[in-house]
Every structure is written in C-alpha cells, then in structure tokens.
C-alpha cells in the first residue's frame, strides 16, 4: 500500500492545460493584489538614502497610508499587472524544463534547480521593462521626486492618474535612455532572480520532504507544503537580498554599473545596506508564498487529467 507521506509531484504531462492556464491567471491576480503594497514599500526602502524618509517597513506603511491613502500603496499596480504574462511564461518554462531534464536526471533537486533558473531567465526578459516603469511609478509621492523621474502634475499639485502617469514615465525614460532604458538593470535582475528561483524550488521540495516525515500519515500534503513555501522563500530572500538592493538602485536611479552601485552603497551605508528591505521582502513573501504554494499545488491538482484525479493524495 502506498505511503501517504510520499509526495507525488504532479508533472506537466499530468495536467489539463486549459484548466491550468485559466485557473492560473485568476490565482496570480489575487496574489498580486494582496502583496503589492509590500512590494512598493520594499522598493522605497531600498532606494532611499539611509533612513531619510522611512525608518522601517511599518513606518513606511503608516506614512504612505497617511499621505496618499490606500491608493498610495498601489501606485504602478495597473502597469504591474502586465507581469501576469511573464508569470504564465514562468510556470510553463518551469514545468517543461522539468520534463526535459527528467530525460537526463531523476534527481528532484537537479530538476528543480535547472527548471527554476531557466524559468526565471524567461520571465525576467519579459518582466524587466514592466518593472522599470512600475518602480518609477512606485517612487511618486505627492509630486515629490524620489527617483530619477517625476510625473507632471495638475494645477492642484497632484500627479496625473493611471495611464497618464504611465505614459509620462515612459516618455521620460525614452528621452533619457532610449529603448535601452527599459532594460536598465536587466543583468542585475538576472543575477537576483535566477539564483532566487534556482534556490527556492530545491529548498521548497527539501523542506516539504522533511516535514512529511515529521507529520502523521493522515496529515494533508497541502499543510506541510504551505509551511515549506515560506521557509524556502525566507532562505532564498536572505541569500539574494544584497543583489536585489543593487538591482533596485540600478533601475530606479539610472546607474549603469553594478560594481559602482555596490561600491557606493558600501561606502554610504556599509554592509547592512545590503540587507535593506529584507524584512519587507520576507513579510511580503511569507503570506504570498503560502498563497502561491497552496494555490499552485491546488491549481495543479484541479488541473489534473480526469483519469489521474484519484491517484493523488491531498
């Protein structure tokens, strides 16, 4: 009799692709809405010099809420929703790469590491231009200039709204840097997210496997998968946060050199500057990763081909 503690990974060939994509887009959108405020806060914390404006995640949350209201926590959100495309490309690349690597290695760690890195490469190629625009929108604060660019305002001093701001930022990027400006920080993004993704998946499966041995046989897999996700996210965040800080500064401040940005950060703020925004990153990653893991594993189970439904333990 099959041991229910054994986690059977649902692979690409087991899925009903139509269900997978329809459910996947809806799930991703819900996650984006829930975690976007902390993404915005993390971006502002990483770009500010020292503690010139915000003294931490909670302080930033309160100040933004008081100054701009709830909409202030969602600056750039409409533009950021276009990353839904990259999200679907990510999961497709991940699953197809796992299938390809399986022909050469049955090690789940190897499959997860290679697939995670490959998926991130594809996704970042789509995401970076969207991130560049949305990050500049995140830095708009009641007409005050926090980044390189500032949207034009109306007579009352308020910035133009929605896609008016977006078009204004796009024009300024084009004037300042040309088309290359939309891929500013591309290499830094790859150096951040490829390792992050490559590390997250093996740690996720490792933690899930270890927890499965500690839990009773009757414990639903989804429980220890939900715990494993945040553990893997925290591990990956700690390892990759220094590069994430540098990536954000390169993209928002318009710097051309990763090395010079690193040196300037070290000179101004020391080694602790590399950990800026880490708490916001982990705070945003914890609930979002639980939702992602529960959602993604449930999505795959709901998308199983009919003849395989009874063969998977929840």
From Swiss-Prot:
The chain crosses the membrane at residues 20-42, 71-90, 113-133, 185-201, 222-239, 278-296. Its main location: mitochondrion. The keyword GTP-binding does not apply. It is found in: Mitochondrion membrane. It is a multi-pass membrane protein. GO terms for biological process: amino acid transport; branched-chain amino acid catabolic process; branched-chain amino acid transport; regulation of cold-induced thermogenesis. It catalyses: L-valine(in) = L-valine(out); L-leucine(in) = L-leucine(out). One of its GO terms (cellular component) is mitochondrial membrane. Solcar repeats lie at residues 18-100, 107-210, 220-302. Keywords: Amino-acid transport, Membrane, Mitochondrion, Repeat, Transmembrane, Transmembrane helix, Transport. InterPro entries: Mit_carrier, Mitochondrial_sb/sol_carrier, Mt_carrier_dom_sf, SLC25A44. GO terms for molecular function: branched-chain amino acid transmembrane transporter activity. Belongs to the mitochondrial carrier (TC 2.A.29) family. Mitochondrial solute transporter which transports branched-chain amino acid (BCAA; valine, leucine and isoleucine) into mitochondria in brown adipose tissue (BAT). BAT is involved in BCAA catabolism and actively utilizes BCAA in the mitochondria for thermogenesis. PANTHER family: SOLUTE CARRIER FAMILY 25 MEMBER 44. This is Solute carrier family 25 member 44. It comes from Pongo abelii. The gene is SLC25A44.
